[in-house]
């Protein structure tokens, strides 16, 4: 529809930055939508989030996510009528007034863009993807659990299992 096209064009940089940040950090949806401008440090490639249980944590951003985040920041002020008092990192507009992008909006935009790409997914599956790839790359459960903000390494066994399945499939393809 015409409205959907207008929305896509208006929000393209933001939506790609949302997906890039989810994929390049593995943060939870709640951590993403609660990000403020002061929490994002591109110079150090980190974001500061409030984890489950209210604990502050500094999370590294994989380099591939940076160009999308930088592009969004270039258009954020003008496109979303943001002033310095608009602290939310990801914005939408309601009646031309900037507002924090909500969890449901992020779920819908991830679903819409990923479905259009032929790979329907969710914000949590993007977190899972980062964890699996990081584990495959490092085989380091502690490193993966720290990146995801898990208290222990038990949850990482899920990603290790996925990596083992991937290995099995790869061997079958030889």
Q: Where would I find each of the regions flagged by the language model?
A:
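Conserved catalytic core of the tyrosine transesterase superfamily
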Residues: 1-174
């Amino acid at each position: 529809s015409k409205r959907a096209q207008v929305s896509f064009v208006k929000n393209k940089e933001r939506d790609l930055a949302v997906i890039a940040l989810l994929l390049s950090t593995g943060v939870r949806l709640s951590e993403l939508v609660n990000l403020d401008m002061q929490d994002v440090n591109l110079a150090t490639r980190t974001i500061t989030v409030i984890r489950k249980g209210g604990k502050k944590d500094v999370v590294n951003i994989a380099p591939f996510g940076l160009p999308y985040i930088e592009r969004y920041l270039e258009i954020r002020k003008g496109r979303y009528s943001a002033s310095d008092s608009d602290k939310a990192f990801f914005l939408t507009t309601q009646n031309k007034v900037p507002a924090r992008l909500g969890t449901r909006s992020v779920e819908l935009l991830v679903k819409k863009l990923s479905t259009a790409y032929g790979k329907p997914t969710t914000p949590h599956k993007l977190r899972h993807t980062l964890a699996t790839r990081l584990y495959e790359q490092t085989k380091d459960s502690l490193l993966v659990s720290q990146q995801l903000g898990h208290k222990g390494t038990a949850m990482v066994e899920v990603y290790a299992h996925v990596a083992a399945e991937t290995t099995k499939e790869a061997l079958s393809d030889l």
